[in-house]
From Swiss-Prot:
<keyword id="KW-0687">Ribonucleoprotein</keyword>
<dbReference type="InterPro" id="IPR000218">
    <property type="entry name" value="Ribosomal_uL14"/>
</dbReference>
<dbReference type="GO" id="GO:0017022">
    <property type="term" value="F:myosin binding"/>
</dbReference>
<comment type="similarity">
    <text>Belongs to the universal ribosomal protein uL14 family.</text>
</comment>
<dbReference type="InterPro" id="IPR019972">
    <property type="entry name" value="Ribosomal_uL14_CS"/>
</dbReference>
<keyword id="KW-0689">Ribosomal protein</keyword>
<dbReference type="GO" id="GO:0022625">
    <property type="term" value="C:cytosolic large ribosomal subunit"/>
</dbReference>
<protein>
    <recommendedName>
        <fullName>Large ribosomal subunit protein uL14</fullName>
    </recommendedName>
</protein>
<dbReference type="InterPro" id="IPR036853">
    <property type="entry name" value="Ribosomal_uL14_sf"/>
</dbReference>
<dbReference type="GO" id="GO:0022626">
    <property type="term" value="C:cytosolic ribosome"/>
</dbReference>
<dbReference type="GO" id="GO:0070180">
    <property type="term" value="F:large ribosomal subunit rRNA binding"/>
</dbReference>
<dbReference type="GO" id="GO:0003735">
    <property type="term" value="F:structural constituent of ribosome"/>
</dbReference>
<dbReference type="Pfam" id="PF00238">
    <property type="entry name" value="Ribosomal_L14"/>
</dbReference>
<dbReference type="GO" id="GO:0002181">
    <property type="term" value="P:cytoplasmic translation"/>
</dbReference>
């Protein structure tokens, strides 16, 4: 029995290593007032029994704010991963990783809630999310 869905995608997103499972806490790299983001669920993950869904660079996930402004805390909101510590392979064969895990809060359309991003944004994320790329100070 062959595995289904293992072929390459036309355009789309290149498969990268997933470094942030459900329950992970990462830095919030925008100026919304949130200090960190807690991963609740990952968009588009079908899953398998007993396997934790995980997010990688460029993935949208459902998050809550654990530290930050009181008006942001105790609410469920979408966010996007912009950096991860786990090394992932680019198309040109080079492995890249960042010094922290970070995400930004967005709305359902992918538009940022904040207006600035601290630190670099992965190229993979910038290609998928143009509104995040326009607010990025540097793209790595």
């Amino acid at each position: 029995m062959s595995k289904r869905g293992r072929g390459g995608t036309a355009g789309g997103k290149f498969r990268i290593s997933l470094g942030l499972p459900v329950g992970a806490v990462m830095n919030c790299a925008d100026n919304t007032g949130a200090k960190n983001l807690y991963v609740i669920a990952v968009h588009g993950i079908r899953g398998r029994l007993n396997r934790l869904p995980a997010a990688g660079v460029g993935d949208m996930f459902v998050a809550t704010v654990k530290k930050g402004k009181p008006e942001l805390r105790k609410k469920v909101m979408p966010a996007v991963v912009i950096r991860q510590r786990k090394p992932f392979r680019r198309r040109d064969g080079v492995f890249i990783y960042f010094e922290d895990n970070a995400g930004v809060i967005v709305n359902n359309k992918g538009e940022m809630k904040g207006s600035a991003i601290t630190g670099p944004v992965a190229k993979e994320c910038a290609d998928l999310w143009p509104r995040i790329a326009s607010n990025a100070s540097s793209i790595a």
